[in-house]
């Protein structure tokens, strides 16, 4: 069932959305003080569309700070995912995928996390190591559906887990999405995006029916099985694949984080957050064995950084 959600916004975080204060959602970079005097940004100020509790929006948020940008270098616009603002025809004209982060520079739109971060690096006051070769492969891997950090947030493997998530933010979040989709789909401005709305209404509606206890029993059980498989995928990746990407200390890019680390750090943080944990060591319950030493070391390298502390000051997401 969850495969119906292909294109499901890779920038949201239901488990922590309700706890995000408005100031966190709308002023993601305002407390940052640049130590650099200049960047190579164009005369037209870039606009970054983001949301404070988003897994993939955290990638440019951390990168922004690591790259030495000042608080006025890029205009920040919040797209409220709880209210489905990413599904408005106006936003679809900017990004037909309705995903965050999105960056616009004049008439040019960058509509994937990879494109946004690549632009920020290319125009930054402070150089960092760009991903090449195997590092690009790592970025591509963690953006694949079988270890999707967004489905990790919304999955349920039992009635008990489903109830706990529904009683939190998930049911309200899915309902808000569905309401926005159905509202926008019937407007004249939405006509050119009719296929998009049809697919999204069906996909989000299927997941909503599970959490609203309106899905047939067989559909619910299939969802549970997909959820169990997803966590097995995550477990295998963290235990057996991720350590092979990581150094004994520091970051994949070296002593300081590089392009690959911006993506990988946000992915790992989201997976930890979906379990309700606050530290990587707490993953042991889900992993059913100790967290690999390299993963624990990588987590410490990130959680000691000022950029990471600022972005996740209100909690992991």
Question: Language-model segments: which ranges?
Answer:
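Compositionally biased, intrinsically disordered low-complexity segments enriched in Pro/Arg/Gln/His
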Residues: 12, 20-21
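Intrinsic disorder/low-complexity segments
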Residues: 16-19, 29-31, 38, 297
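GST-like domain detector, emphasizing the conserved glutathione-binding G-site
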Residues: 25-199
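C-terminal or late-domain output modules
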Residues: 41-69, 73-87, 91, 101-103, ...
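GST-like fold's C-terminal all-alpha helical module
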Residues: 151-290, 294-296
